Amino acid sequence: MDAEKMLEIDGSYLEGGGQALRNALSLSCILGKPVRVVKIRASRPSPGLSHQHLHGLNLLRDITNADVVGNYLLSSTVEFTPRTILDNTYRVETHTAASITLIYQMALPVLLFAGRPSRLIVSGGTNVDFAPPVEYMQEVLLPNLKHFGVSFDLKVQRYGFYPRGQGRCQLDVQPVTKLNSGKLVAFGRIKSVSGVAYCAGRLPVNIAIDMQQTAQREIHRLWPSQQCSIEPIKHSRQKAFHNGAGILMTVNTTSDVVLGASALGKKRIDGHVLGSEASCQLGDYMRKQVCVDDYMQDQLIIYMALAVGRSTMRTGKLTNHTRTAINVAEQMTGVKFDVAMEPGGQMLVSCKGLGHVNKLI
């Protein structure tokens, strides 16, 4: 590899987690730009590539037939030189509880620029800490990406929780010619507040019911006239082998705004606490009338950077994940993001996208 032609990304920027690596590699694949990522996950207790990041890296290597240096566990530097994006059926077996959704987060934007539809089957954790739950990807990410002209189908074949994992999902991706600009700035009126409270394994359904009742009670306390429908679910042994519990709540508005809030059970699971946590978070979004929630911010940056025309989102205080994503996108694409605070405290984030065109279709 020619080191002089390789763009270098500092993986320790701000939060120093995996965000810089994920976005840099995805953009490298899409744009055909070699990249070197250094100081990977420098701020984490175990710096360097984790199992999840290594699986994602090797997946992108396969998708683009890339040359890679540094693809081993705990590696702090990776050099990645992609070739063309290959549509195919890809399988990733993590053999751990590595996050399925974070692996999808790396691959989805890349497969959008393949020549034909692709399928990606991944085993690992569907609902694990420090990652979006799979329900969030289905119920919140998908409708948000529809603003950019993106379509995908995500099926959960089996749920998997920490520490054993063993979940399995299938993602089918339709390629695009280009990404439309997204305008997520008008909150509109609330149409519905809904969600799912789930438990699995040896955990009793009462935990899901506790989450449901507390979440609904909290929403009704804050908005007495607002209907809130949470479905309690106990997953069968065929659908989820091991213990796990959590809740995802969403709000849908007349302006096609979809916001999500979730909570995940840890070792000692209290359904009332989880229900309160998710409903309070969602209630805060509703009160501030943001159009993009805190966990969607960073995921939209790569699509805004690549889209044709100017994209804008109204959100809350920018997370370090989002600031990192902006930093990487600006270096990789040359676009400029504008961030302004509004009188109500919301942040308006916009950029004129690169207008990247899929030449494989």
From Swiss-Prot:
Instruction: Name the enzyme's class.
Output: ligase
Annotated keywords: ATP-binding, Ligase, Nucleotide-binding, Nucleus
Which compartment or compartments is the protein found in? Nucleus, Nucleoplasm; Nucleus
UniProt record, GO biological process: negative regulation of axon regeneration; RNA processing
Q: InterPro entries of this UniProt entry?
A: RNA3'-term_phos_cycl_insert, RNA3'_phos_cyclase_dom, RNA3'_phos_cyclase_dom_sf, RNA3'_term_phos_cyc, RNA3'_term_phos_cyc_type_1, RNA3'P_cycl/enolpyr_Trfase_a/b, RPTC_insert
Which branch of life, at top level? Eukaryota
- Please name the catalytic residues of this protein: 321 (tele-amp-histidine intermediate)
Provide the binding site for ATP. Answer: 105, 132, 295, 298-299, 321
Q: What happens when the gene is disrupted?
A: Severed axons of RNAi-mediated knockdown class III dendritic arborization (da) neurons, display increased regeneration.
**Record keyword Metal-binding present:** no
Matching entries from Pfam families are given as:
RTC, RTC_insert
MF terms from GO for this chain are: ATP binding; RNA-3'-phosphate cyclase activity
Give the catalysed reaction(s), semicolon-separated: a 3'-end 3'-phospho-ribonucleotide-RNA + ATP = a 3'-end 2',3'-cyclophospho-ribonucleotide-RNA + AMP + diphosphate
Q: What is its EC number?
A: 6.5.1.4
Q: Which residues form a coiled coil?
A: none
Protein family? Belongs to the RNA 3'-terminal cyclase family. Type 1 subfamily.
Name by which UniProt lists this protein: RNA 3'-terminal phosphate cyclase
